[in-house]
Design a protein with these regions (language model features):
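Short acidic/His/Gly/Ser-rich catalytic and metal-binding motifs that mark active-site loops
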Residues: 9-15, 181-184
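Conserved N-terminal catalytic core of the sugar/cofactor nucleotidyltransferase
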Residues: 1-4, 12-14, 26, 30-104
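Short beta-strand-to-loop acidic/aromatic patch adjacent to the donor-nucleotide binding site
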Residues: 103-114
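Short beta-strand/turn micro-motifs composed of small residues
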Residues: 6-7, 53, 110, 133-134
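Short alpha-helical oligomerization interface
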Residues: 18-23
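Conserved alpha/beta core of the MobA/IspD/sugar-nucleotide pyrophosphorylase nucleotidyltransferase superfamily
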Residues: 2, 167-247
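A short acidic, often aromatic-flanked loop/helix-cap motif at beta-alpha or helix-coil junctions
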Residues: 82-87, 139, 225-228
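Conserved core of the sugar-phosphate nucleotidyltransferase
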Residues: 114-194
C-alpha cells in the first residue's frame, strides 16, 4: 500500500497568499498532486493508494477526481477532523481508519515531492524497511547515518540534525505496517520527550526504534536530479518558473 499523508496546514503557503491547499496548486498543466502521484505511475494498477487528508476542505472529492483521471485503480481517502502532531501520527490514524493489516507493506510518500519514474529498489526487498536519500546541503532535512561506508544498512536516523550528507527525500518503506505502528505508538507514549527532541512526530526518527530492536533497515540513494521538491513557496515557485518537463 502506498500511503500519502496530506493533512498538513500548509501554513507557509497560506502566509504567502495561496488560498487553496498546496497539493491543488497548478504545475505544468496539472495539479501538484497529480505531478507527485505520477511518481508511482507504474504501480497505478497493482497497488492500493491511501490518502490521509483534512476534513472540511473538499479534499476527498478532489483526490478521487484526480485519481480517476490518472487511472489509479484502488484509491481510498481517510479524512481527519483535527490536526495531528505530525506526519507520523497522520499516517498512523489513516492506517487505523483504513483497517490496514499489520502484515501489509507500506510505502509513505510526501505530497510535495516529485520522483519521476520511481521503481522499488530490488536490494530493499529483503529489508525490514528503507529510506530513500539524496546528497544535499543544509540542516532542514531528515538524515540517515550508514553503519559503514561498505554497506547500505542504516545505523541511525535524525531530524534537522546533520549526521551525514544523506538526506531523506520523504519516501519511507516499512515491510510490515505493524512495525511502523509499533514505533509510532512508542513515540506517542513519550510524546513530550519526542516532541522536545524532534519538534513534531516525523517518520524518519521512528526507524531508530526498529534499528534498536534489531530490524534490518537500509537506504537507497537517488540522483539529486531525479527528485524535485515543492514543500515551500520558494521551491514551488522555482518549479513553476523552470518551464521544463520533469524527467
Amino acid at each position: 500500500m502506498i500511503v500519502i499523508p496530506m493533512a498538513g496546514q500548509s501554513r507557509r503557503f497560506r502566509d504567502a497568499g495561496y488560498a487553496r491547499p498546496k497539493y491543488e496548486l497548478p504545475l505544468h498543466g496539472e495539479s501538484l498532486f497529480a505531478c507527485c502521484l505520477r511518481s508511482f505511475e507504474r504501480y497505478f494498477d497493482s497497488e492500493r493508494f491511501l490518502f490521509v487528508a483534512r476534513a472540511g476542505c473538499g479534499a476527498e472529492a478532489f483526490v478521487l477526481e484526480e485519481c480517476a483521471r490518472l487511472g489509479i485503480a484502488e484509491p481510498r481517502v481517510v479524512t481527519l477532523d483535527a490536526p495531528t502532531r505530525g506526519q507520523a501520527e497522520t499516517v498512523l490514524l489513516g492506517l487505523r481508519e483504513a483497517g490496514c493489516p499489520g502484515s501489509d507493506a507500506i510505502l509513505v510518500f510526501n505530497i510535495d515531492t516529485i520522483r519521476p519514474g520511481y521503481s522499488f529498489p530490488p536490494e530493499a526487498a529483503h529489508s525490514d524497511g528503507y529510506l530513500e536519500v539524496v546528497r544535499a546541503a543544509g540542516e532542514h532535512w531528515s538524515f540517515v547515518r550508514p553503519a559503514s561506508s561498505l554497506t547500505r544498512r542504516v545505523a541511525e536516523t535524525s531530524e534537522k540534525r546533520r549526521i551525514s550528507a544523506l538526506c531523506c527525500t520523504g519516501l519511507y518503506y516499512f515491510a510490515r505496517a505493524a512495525d511502523f505502528t509499533a514505533a509510532c505508538e512508542t513515540a506517542l507514549q513519550t510524546a513530550g520527550d519526542y516532541l522536545e527532541c524532534w519538534g513534531e512526530l516525523y517518520v524518519a526518527p521512528l526507524y531508530n526504534t526498529l534499528i534498536g530492536a534489531g530490524k534490518h533497515i537500509v537506504y537507497d540513494e537517488a540522483p539529486a536530479s531525479r527528485v524535485h521538491f515543492a514543500g515551500t513557496p520558494a521551491e514551488y515557485g522555482a518549479l513553476v518558473a523552470s518551464h521544463r518537463s520533469l524527467p
